[in-house]
Regions:
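Substrate-engagement module of ASCE P-loop NTPases
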Residues: 106, 142-152, 180-200
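P-loop NTPase motor core
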Residues: 9, 15, 44-111, 237
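Walker A/P-loop nucleotide-binding motif
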Residues: 23-41
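Conserved P-loop NTPase mechanochemical-coupling segment
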Residues: 80, 86-140, 168-175
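Conserved P-loop NTPase "ATPase switch" module shared by AAA+ and STAND
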Residues: 154-178
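Short regulatory helix/loop adjacent to the ATP-binding pocket of P-loop NTPases
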Residues: 197-199, 210-228
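Conserved small/polar residues in nucleotide/adenosyl-binding loops
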Residues: 245-250
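Structural recognition of the conserved hydrophobic beta-strand(s) that form the central parallel beta-sheet
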Residues: 159-163, 187, 200-207
Length: 250
């Protein structure tokens, strides 16, 4: 936190998730409700990195909940994607943008190139993804392929986090390529989140609850949490008590 900003502690969201342990959760909330901040918080808490990220949580509520919850900190490889800037008028531009996003995320896991758990075929897949040298079919398998390699390398299945999952879909609806983008996203999400033994948990956030039949078809393990649900409601936006407290601080 900075002296120029207020930080509202939402880390008890992590405790609720660990207690409930849903496999895949979709959070839908309006704009400016803290979706991206919460997805980043989940990433920072769970992700296994060279940096000691526990320092960001030592003075937060989750840390006072005990060792059971601390043991989850920094223990998982994480695949993190955000589609918030995928705002284009054509499918071709949208595909290129999604391909670049997946390429950059793949590059963040360069340890796979030298992993003893990955063979030459895995390394070729990695290089193709990292360089963007893939067609639609291969790109739609990116989450499945990357999670498979990470699982074998670390011996722990990764967590997949996708922020603003619905931005490309909204653009498709407005610009006449809805069916194309929905078909692609369905294959991408299914490969990464449906019956995938190489994923521990999945988190998605967005504004819209796109019909489950259209994009999450067959994803029986999906739990949808919307603005109408009481559970997790205190972790998005500000509660009345938080608003009053910040006003007093001001």
């Amino acid at each position: 936190a900075s002296t120029e900003y207020y930080y509202i502690d939402k880390t008890m969201m992590i405790k609720e998730f660990i207690d409930e342990r849903p496999l895949v959760t979709l959070f839908t909330r309006p704009r400016r409700f803290g979706k991206t901040l919460n997805m980043d918080m989940l990433r920072t808490f769970f992700e296994k990195t060279d940096e000691d990220t526990s320092i960001y949580f030592e003075n937060k509520k989750i840390w006072s909940c005990g060792q059971k919850y601390r043991d989850y900190q920094g223990k998982y490889p994480v695949i993190f994607l955000t589609f918030k800037d995928v705002k284009f008028d054509t499918w071709e531009e949208t595909f290129e943008s999604v391909r670049d996003i997946l390429a950059k995320e793949t590059q963040c896991h360069e340890e796979l190139l030298t992993s003893e758990k990955c063979d030459k075929y895995d390394r070729q897949k990695y290089e193709d993804l990292a360089s963007g040298n893939v067609n639609e079919v291969r790109l739609s398998a990116a989450l499945q392929d990357l999670s498979d390699m990470l699982h074998r390398h670390y011996g722990v299945a990764p967590i997949i986090i996708i922020d603003e999952y619905d931005t490309p879909i909204q653009q498709g609806h407005m610009n006449g390529f809805y069916e194309t983008v929905v078909n692609f996203m369905r294959n991408l999400f299914s490969g990464g989140l449906k019956d995938n033994p190489h994923v521990n948990y999945g988190f998605l956030s967005g504004i819209l609850r796109v019909a489950k039949e259209s994009i999450f078809s067959g994803l029986n393990n999906l739990k949808i949490n919307s603005v109408l649900d009481e559970r997790y409601s205190e972790y998005f936006g500000f509660t009345t008590a938080e608003d009053r407290k910040s006003t007093r601080l001001n």
